[in-house]
Amino acid sequence: MATINLTSAEFEAAVTKPGITFVDFWAAWCGPCRMFAPIFEAASEKYPEIQFTKIDTDVEQEIAAAAQISSIPTLMAFRDGILVFREAGALPAPQFEELIKAVQALNMDEVHAEIAKQSNNNEND
């Protein structure tokens, strides 16, 4: 599966659906973005069950601002609608591979329990 270019209007639907979605915030003038692009594209071919999306921050400034993107590339990973990873900077291929496997291996019951626990703690503050 090839990468998908997202617009601001498509972002929420893409990241809230079941499964795993990676979002690469990038720009054409960004050297590290251009270095990471083939790594991201290769992963999209290797893992067709995962959605790999890209957002051009120059074109989609509204969503870049809403997502508080201050440095590019910034990579986000969502699983079942929950942001589980966010980091600025281009990952080397081996690290990106490790990240993909880590997101796949997440126990989402534990993630949901931790979110509920944090929510309860915030309500009790």
Predicted feature descriptions by range:
Residues 117-125:
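Short acidic DE-rich linear segments
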Residues 19, 26-29, 71:
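Short pre-active-site segment immediately N-terminal to redox-active cysteine/selenocysteine motifs
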Residues 2, 26, 51-53:
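Conserved Rossmann-like nucleotide-binding pocket used by diverse enzymes
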Residues 30-33, 75:
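The canonical Cys-X-X-Cys-His
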